[in-house]
């Protein structure tokens, strides 16, 4: 993705891979369709709550699964079974933001699962989540800038083509 962006901008800059931006591990839900994920999460949650599989209705599994996905999309609450180290993601964003020299512009490319933790650099994550959809859409762009030692988000999840109109 970074190569493509740099080519389109006709810019020749080095690309540095940073493991802090690597996509999260969705565990058993990796590469699965959303319907399957929703049912699996709902079933797993209900079984954990003591219900037996024979007593689980598909509607109830879907209802709970949708609720768990909504928590992920609205508050970054990691569903059961996903291999996500939230503290590592948060500290990675804080370390990365602190490492960017004043006056430099960086293009960071990552997935929505990782990007949803980037607002921690703002210092007001809960407020940000209350006013933004933290699920970054496919192809979405998030723009941050730093003034002094204070980061701000000027654009969140906008489609790239809208930047070039």
Feature annotation, model-predicted:
Residues 1-59:
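Phosphate-coordination/substrate-recognition cap region in phosphate-metabolizing enzymes
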Residues 7, 11, 24-35, 99-105, ...:
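Acidic, low-complexity terminal tails and accessory targeting/binding regions
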Residues 17, 101-110, 114:
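Beta-strand elements within well-structured catalytic alpha/beta cores of enzymes
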Residues 42-84:
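Short glycine/proline- and acidic residue-enriched helix-loop micro-motifs
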Residues 75-101:
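A mid-sequence, solvent-exposed acidic-amphipathic segment
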């Amino acid at each position: 993705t970074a190569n493509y962006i740099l080519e389109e901008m006709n810019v020749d800059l080095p690309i540095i891979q940073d493991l802090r931006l690597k996509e999260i591990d969705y565990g058993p839900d990796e590469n699965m369709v959303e319907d399957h994920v929703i049912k699996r999460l709902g079933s797993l949650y209900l079984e954990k709550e003591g219900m037996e599989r024979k007593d689980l209705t598909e509607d109830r599994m879907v209802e709970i699964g949708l609720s768990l996905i909504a928590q992920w999309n609205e508050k970054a609450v990691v569903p059961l079974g996903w291999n996500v180290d939230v503290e590592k993601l948060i500290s990675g964003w804080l370390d990365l933001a602190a490492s960017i020299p004043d006056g430099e512009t960086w293009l960071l490319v990552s997935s929505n699962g990782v990007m949803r933790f980037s607002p921690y650099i703002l210092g007001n994550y809960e407020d940000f989540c209350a006013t933004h959809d933290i699920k970054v859409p496919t192809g979405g762009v998030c723009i941050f800038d730093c003034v002094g030692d204070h980061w701000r988000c000027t654009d969140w999840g906008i489609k790239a083509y809208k930047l070039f109109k």
